[in-house]
From Swiss-Prot:
<dbReference type="InterPro" id="IPR011708">
    <property type="entry name" value="DNA_pol3_alpha_NTPase_dom"/>
</dbReference>
<dbReference type="InterPro" id="IPR012340">
    <property type="entry name" value="NA-bd_OB-fold"/>
</dbReference>
<dbReference type="GO" id="GO:0005737">
    <property type="term" value="C:cytoplasm"/>
</dbReference>
<dbReference type="InterPro" id="IPR029460">
    <property type="entry name" value="DNAPol_HHH"/>
</dbReference>
<keyword id="KW-0378">Hydrolase</keyword>
<dbReference type="Pfam" id="PF00929">
    <property type="entry name" value="RNase_T"/>
</dbReference>
<keyword id="KW-0963">Cytoplasm</keyword>
<dbReference type="InterPro" id="IPR004013">
    <property type="entry name" value="PHP_dom"/>
</dbReference>
<keyword id="KW-0235">DNA replication</keyword>
<keyword id="KW-0548">Nucleotidyltransferase</keyword>
<protein>
    <recommendedName>
        <fullName>DNA polymerase III PolC-type</fullName>
        <ecNumber>2.7.7.7</ecNumber>
    </recommendedName>
</protein>
<keyword id="KW-0808">Transferase</keyword>
<dbReference type="InterPro" id="IPR036397">
    <property type="entry name" value="RNaseH_sf"/>
</dbReference>
<dbReference type="InterPro" id="IPR006054">
    <property type="entry name" value="DnaQ"/>
</dbReference>
<comment type="similarity">
    <text>Belongs to the DNA polymerase type-C family. PolC subfamily.</text>
</comment>
<dbReference type="Pfam" id="PF07733">
    <property type="entry name" value="DNA_pol3_alpha"/>
</dbReference>
<dbReference type="InterPro" id="IPR016195">
    <property type="entry name" value="Pol/histidinol_Pase-like"/>
</dbReference>
Length: 1435
């Protein structure tokens, strides 16, 4: 059957090796009916792995196309076991069949021992490795036997010596980590067993593919982590990189000395790690089990600038250049100082957002100066339909009366100064008809390259038959004479011919050129592309790409296009050249490509002018992108204008236009920037050679010197180190907002791309870049002397002001004090209690002295407006710690100690030793003077937490207005101060980790680069923080005093470049100018909206809600006050579902464990739940394990100051400690010593040291006050509560389930709850996750005896739920239906109000509802009350 094997191999295209030609196929069987095939393959000799694999895969692929089922039986007559071949077979089985771990990188070939009888031993060097291999060995044995290795037996053995040597460690740790820790050493230092191992030194790239098990690697630490297990064993993890690759290393240990070693290793330290390569159990990712680790010196030599006279970089980009620069201001300044450079110029792209950080880093540094500038995008105001400015004498030329030469040229390249003309084609048009055609080739001086031939189809033979250049130009000149030139992208053709005419002494005067490309942009601004073929397609002109790029063909196509364009102009009433010349629109400008110039501020006045230019280009001149008109840039003695870098108009003209254009362009600038030749490397494979670039740069320097311009060499750096180039390339290849592309991005992926290395260069490195000039004196001049000359003209500039500038408004300093005392007298009596008088004066004095009164006064006016319109206002932040804020009506939180006050006779009683720090927890009590019930108030909050210990901190007054009222308040602020002085607080959106990861993965795939996950993690970490776009604070409004312009502080822009926005935002992130200008935080919140609805539905004013109520406090720990048990609501232990700030799973769990009993306890819960490391592993442990209560633990930042003062700690130290702890800075040893002296317990001190962030008590109190009120309505007005909840607090419903019985609803909840934690295809969708809380609330409502009806076509509202008291149920609105939306819901209600719906047909006609929603309405039974059609009404 050898012949059948040969035939079969031909069929499957398998080349049979000589030694396998005796192979036979036996017992073939084919069952066509069952689509089954089987056979036996008998190998005489043992097949080599690669041959077997190829045969096996090709056989399988072939049979898969013929039958559904197949069975192959392999036999090998002469079996020979060779270790290297067996290793390959095992690797393949693991990768292709077992698919559970990377076997080939898991063990070394030395771990295999092969016996001739087929027994093969695999040695595992740890219990961990043994467990990993076990399942695979069993699988591999069966697979190898099926391949014909009949007696194959792979046996696993364990290196017992290693296990014995490590046994002491194994017995000392918790059982759950025994497996991993069994092979660990006693410390990071060498153990006895370690000394017996030979660790192979590898690079991190080699590590990825090595077959070695014990390795030694070197890298820089970029991530470290310590995990403490339940058994107190610690897992030390580090990630290291050598900038080519990365890996992770870890160690299990319980030893203190290991902790010390690990603590000594910091991020950016270089280390040498020795250990064993292992795989993670779940992910099977490689890591090194650390046996030894030690810090070493960095093997990478620091670059130094050793020149005596040093250069200055005048064109640096930072992270604030959108999707371009990758360095922070700190990175840039540190490197500049390392080089001992005296200054750098920061020129971000249409942005000055990095200025504040540069200012803060360097303003007080006398030896270093930042030059503040900007790379500005510019375009011409001219529409450039006429390539050169149209002279007045041609203005009245009639379009249809002229003769036109519609032409195209082909060239050897893109540069009129460097390349040659090889073909000309033209059609002459008169009165809309072609009267002449011309076509000829021109002989070039150099041989035609293959690229040009491939693009155009023109060969060297074509050109040999052409005209000499001089003759050709004279012929072209005669064709153009007294006619108008027309070309597509005419600037290229026009300038190319113009340069050739001038070079050959042929007159080129008053040649008028029309560009059909720009004409198309004006006439058809909606086209996505304006290439000749695209425009032809849009105008239905025939265009064949296979013939295109020939002058004769392209000119004939363009002729037909231009005839149609003239017709369109006539239809639009455009008849004269001057009318054509003046055509423009914002859409047209949005299609224009901008070029970049440099602008530098020379002094403080120049900074403001720069800010104004920045504002203008981001607002007034924003045409799809920032593009300022060249013509509108005013020259100033306070600014320097540079020619720009790689993407500048000057470089564009140098490479793609005429010498005359270049000379005219040079005249526009104060100094000429010459980019480093290496920055043009991306041109080398597509447009220009390195030599051509250098020739042109030499010309530019020569011409600029002839015009006595200051010439400076620039590097345009984006990064400091060579390895960072890959990060810049990632951004070059990533799309920004609205799919914007980087200027260096090359669309043609079939070309090799050599992106420039835009590293920050030393003086010597830059001199080397310009060595092609062969003139040391000239090189010194442009690299060192002239940049320093520019720097010497620049003053040290202050970017951020050093004090607060508040608006003068409404005599606020007088009116605020008056209002505060009037309200104090009204509440506490004319003779104010001493404690209140002192507190008012303590606050008012600094508020008035520092000019903070206007902030209070404006806030008070806005709150009163909201209240007068029926909307409550909640306070945020620490404003509630100010009694002045309370008395001016800004906040409801009273910061005084717990006290009683009589609203009738002003009896005042400060409670001694109150049960809690909240006055709301005081028992009800009658006035001893007039027998009226006393009001109770006071939350014990020190004023220092708001304005600082010296009361000089700029106040943040954050207010929660109703979400539906927020816009009106914003407009009110604008009305009060004017649109030129009110701006939304700007933010900067940068690339987050998840987005950076996506960029990197896409780039690596595109570039066919393969890096480990660890190196991707490293790149991700280093790629974050780059600017993507701008944004705005959700409620922050900046107010600029009338006597200033906004540019005295910051430029402005539209948020996220939305030119339709009614507000502009500060260009600087608002934090940068926080201490300079007034910021109001006017936020939108659900609570005021919900409470207004509850007041309306119940008639109960929130002011009348009791401050102490047993039922209300009880629902935070039990549902009993709601009339239900926990069992009735799926085991929920509290009644807090749906209560703002307390209804989340996390907080409800806190409630069930901490069991709050008072209002003060609720404030503590609010503080704990909003802090970081305040509850988890901190207060939670203290309450559960140490038996402390909520009032004893630290929950809010203010607690620390209050508690410490009570213990006798000095007030200033108490304040300092509070500030440190709330910011996560812990305590100093001296502070701990003093606290112990004052009797502060250890658990309290340890608790403070764990805290990373703390919530202000005033904010927590304001939240709890709102929650308390909502809880009141939930307890006493259930239907009103649920109607409000569904109307205001959720947008996600499953109304079909919600309107069914409780059993069905509970079943759905259980299903979703089960799937909530799944991580497979059955996990919850985003909508289901968001709907689940709504279903829990609906279930609770049903448990209380209430129901939800179906949507009622005659009654339901658009958005609000209706209460049906008679049936104890709610009627849902239309907007709960998926896909319907508020607009359509309102349209249904409006149509119904006009006239009752007669039928489904009538409903559809009047609402415009789509068929999908109609079917949804029908399936839900909403149309049951009306007939299908109108016919019944016509009878």
């Amino acid at each position: 059957m050898q012949e059948s094997f040969l035939n079969f191999c031909q069929e499957i295209n398998f080349d049979i090796p000589e030694y396998l030609k005796n192979t036979k196929i036996a017992n073939p069987y084919h069952d066509e009916e069952k689509s089954f095939f089987s056979c036996e393959i008998d190998f005489l000799e043992t097949p080599k792995f690669e041959d077997f694999k190829s045969f096996y895969l090709k056989t399988k692929n072939f049979l898969n196309q013929l039958v559904k089922e197949q069975k192959l039986l392999f036999k090998i007559e002469n079996i020979f076991y060779e270790k290297s071949e067996i290793k390959k077979y095992l690797d393949w089985i693991a990768e292709h069949f077992f698919k559970n771990f990377d076997f080939k990188n898991t063990f070394r070939i030395d771990d295999l021992k092969v016996n001739l009888d087929g027994k093969i031993f695999l040695t595992a060097h740890s219990k961990h490795s043994f467990d990993l291999y076990k399942d695979f060995v069993e699988f591999a044995n069966k697979k190898m036997q099926s391949f014909g290795f009949e007696n194959f037996l792979l046996k696993l053995e364990l290196n017992q010596i290693e296990i014995t040597n490590n046994q002491p460690l194994v017995s000392s740790i918790n059982s759950q980590v025994k497996t991993q820790a069994s092979s660990e050493n006693q410390s990071f230092k060498k153990s006895n067993f370690y000394n017996k191992k030979r660790h192979i030194q590898l690079s991190l790239k080699e590590l990825i593919k090595t077959q070695e098990m014990f390795v030694s690697v070197v890298g820089m630490v970029f991530k470290k982590e310590i995990i403490t297990t339940n058994s107190k064993t610690k897992i030390f993890k580090i990630s290291i990189t050598d900038f080519q690759e990365a890996t992770r290393a870890q160690k299990f240990s319980y030893l203190e000395k290991d902790q010390e070693i690990f603590d000594s290793i910091q991020i950016n330290d270089w280390v040498n790690v020795c250990g064993e390569i292992q795989l993670e159990k779940m992910s099977l990712k490689q890591f090194i089990k650390i046996e030894k680790i030690e810090k070493i010196r960095s093997p990478i030599k620091d670059r130094q600038d050793n020149e005596k006279e040093k250069r200055i970089e005048l064109s640096f980009r930072s992270k604030m250049s959108t999707m371009d620069g990758i360095l922070s201001p700190l990175d840039i300044v540190k490197q500049a100082k390392k080089f001992n450079h005296s200054s750098i110029a920061i020129l971000d792209h249409n942005s000055v957002q990095a200025f504040p950080d540069f200012h803060n880093l360097t303003y007080k540094d006398k030896d270093f100066k930042v030059i503040y500038g900007m790379t500005l995008s510019v375009i011409s105001k001219r529409n450039k339909i006429f390539v050169e400015p149209l002279k007045d004498k041609f203005f009245d030329y009639k379009i249809l009366d002229q003769e036109y030469v519609v032409y195209d040229i082909e060239t050897t390249g893109l540069s009129p100064m460097l390349n040659e003309l090889i073909q000309f084609g033209a059609s002459v048009i008169k009165n809309g008809r072609i009267i002449e055609t011309h076509h000829f080739f021109i002989k070039p001086k150099s041989k035609l390259d293959s690229f040009t031939t491939k693009l155009t189809g023109i060969t060297q033979e074509h050109l040999e038959k052409g005209y000499e250049l001089q003759e050709a130009l004279e012929k072209i000149s005669s064709i153009f004479k007294a006619r108008i030139m027309v070309a597509h992208n005419a600037a290229f053709d026009h300038n190319f011919l113009k340069q050739k005419f001038i070079d050959n002494n042929i007159e080129f005067e008053e040649m008028i050129s029309i560009d059909t490309l720009n004409l198309a942009k004006v006439l058809n601004p909606i086209y996505r592309s304006y290439r000749l073929g695209e425009v032809a397609s849009k105008l239905s002109v025939v265009y064949d790409p296979s013939i295109a790029h020939r002058a004769d063909y392209d000119s004939s196509v363009l002729t037909n296009i231009f005839i149609l364009q003239m017709s369109h102009l006539k239809e639009k009433g455009i008849n004269l050249f001057k009318e054509l010349n003046s055509l423009s629109s914002e859409k047209f400008y949005s299609k224009m490509f901008a070029k970049d110039i440099s602008i530098i501020a020379k002094n403080q006045a120049g900074l403001k002018e720069l800010f104004k230019i920045n504002s203008d280009v981001l607002t007034k001149y924003y045409f799809a992108n920032p593009k300022m008109f060249w013509e509108d840039i005013k020259r100033s003695k306070n600014l320097l204008i540079g020619s720009g870098g790689l993407n500048s108009p000057l470089i564009d003209k140098l490479l793609f236009s005429t010498q005359e254009d270049v000379l005219n362009e040079i005249d526009k600038y104060d100094y000429i920037e010459i980019p480093s030749p290496n920055n043009f490397s991306h041109f080398w494979t597509t447009k220009f050679s390195d030599q051509q670039i250098k020739i042109q740069l030499q010309k530019l320097i020569k011409w600029a010197k002839e015009k006595n311009k200051i010439i400076v060499a620039i590097g345009e750096p984006r990064y400091n180190e060579k390895w960072q180039k890959i990060i810049h390339e990632i951004y070059i290849n990533s799309t920004g907002i609205e799919n914007s592309l980087h200027p260096l991005f090359i669309i043609k992926k079939d070309m090799d791309t050599f992106y420039p290395e835009q590293i920050y260069k030393t003086t010597n490195e830059m001199k080397q870049e310009f060595s092609f000039l062969y003139d040391p004196e000239l090189i010194e001049e442009i690299v060192v002397k002239n940049p320093n000359l520019i720097s010497s003209q620049i003053e040290k500039i202050q970017v951020i002001k050093d004090k607060l500038y508040t608006p003068k408004f409404d005599d606020s300093h007088i009116k605020l004090k008056k209002l505060v005392y009037e309200n104090a007298w009204k509440k506490y009596g004319k003779n104010l209690p001493e404690i209140i008088e002192q507190r008012i004066e303590k606050e008012l004095t600094p508020i008035l002295n520092y000019g903070f009164d206007v902030i209070y006064w404006i806030s008070s006016i806005l709150v009163q407006k909201s209240l007068s319109d029926g909307y409550l206002v909640g306070s945020r932040g620490s404003i509630g710690s100010s009694l002045v804020a309370t008395l001016s009506g800004i906040t409801e939180v009273n910061p005084l100690a717990p006290h009683y006050i009589c609203s009738k006779c002003q009896y005042f009683e400060l409670v001694k030793d109150p049960m809690t720090n909240s006055g709301f927890d005081l028992d009800d009590k009658k006035c001893p003077k007039c027998n009226s019930f006393l009001d109770k108030d006071g939350q014990t909050i020190p004023f220092e937490t708001f304005l600082g210990f010296k009361a000089d901190k700029v106040p943040d007054i954050d207010l929660n207005f109703s979400g539906e009222y927020q816009g009106k308040i914003h407009d009110e602020v604008k009305r009060l101060f004017g649109s030129k002085h009110t701006f939304r607080a700007g933010t900067i959106s940068t690339v987050a980790e998840k987005t950076a990861y996506g960029y990197i993965k896409k780039y690596l795939e595109t570039a066919s680069l393969d890096y480990s996950d660890n190196f991707v993690d490293f790149l991700t970490e280093k790629s974050t923080g780059v600017k993507r776009t701008t944004g705005q604070h959700p409620g922050g409004i900046i107010i600029i005093p009338k006597e200033f312009d906004v540019e005295d502080f910051t430029p402005v822009n539209f948020p996220a470049n939305d030119t339709e926005s009614s507000w502009k935002t500060t260009h600087f992130d608002f934090h940068a100018i926080h201490d300079n200008v007034l910021k109001l935080d006017i936020l939108g919140h659900d609570d005021p909206t919900a409470l207004k609805m509850l007041e309306k539905l119940t008639g109960v004013n929130v002011k009348d809600i009791p401050k102490k109520d047993e039922k209300i406090i009880s629902i935070f720990t039990s549902p009993k006050a709601l009339g239900i048990s926990s069992e009735e609501i799926l085991g929920e232990k509290t009644g807090a579902l749906g209560i703002p700030e307390f209804g989340t799973n996390f907080v409800r769990q806190m409630l069930s464990e901490a069991k709050p009993k008072t209002f003060a306890d609720l404030v503590s819960i609010s503080g704990l739940s909003h802090g970081t490391d305040v509850w988890i592993n901190n207060a939670h442990y203290i309450i559960q394990s140490l038996g402390k209560t909520l009032d004893q633990v630290i929950s809010c930042r203010d607690d620390i100051m209050v508690d410490l003062i009570k213990k006798g700690v000095p007030i200033d130290l108490s304040f300092t400690i509070m500030e440190q702890v709330r910011k996560g800075k812990g305590l100093s040893l001296e502070q701990k010593r003093k606290l112990i002296e004052h009797g502060i317990e250890n658990w309290y001190i340890e608790s403070m040291e764990k805290i990373k962030y703390m919530f202000p008590k005033a904010h927590a109190t304001a939240y709890v006050l709102m929650a308390w009120r909502v809880a009141f309505y939930k307890v006493y007005y259930p239907l009103e509560y649920y109607a409000t909840y569904f109307s205001t607090r959720t947008e996600f419903f499953d109304i079909e389930i919600m309107s069914k019985d409780k059993l069905t609803l509970e079943s759905k909840i259980k299903e979703l709850a089960y799937r909530e934690n799944l991580r497979n295809d059955n996990q919850l969708t985003t909508k289901e996750k968001n709907t689940l809380p709504t279903l829990y609330i609906a279930n609770e409502m049903k448990a209380r005896g209430f129901n939800i009806q179906n949507i009622n076509l005659k009654i339901s509202l658009a958005n609000d739920w209706i209460i049906d008291k008679n049936s104890k149920s709610l009627i849902p609105p239309f907007n709960v239906i998926d896909g319907l939306g508020e607009t359509l819901a309102q349209k249904i209600v409006d149509s119904r109000n006009e006239k009752e719906f007669l039928s489904v047909e009538d409903f559809i006609n009047r609402t415009g509802i789509n068929s999908t929603l109609v079917e949804k309405f029908k399936s839900m039974g909403i149309f049951e009350q009306i007939p299908e059609t109108n016919q019944i009404f016509l009878i």
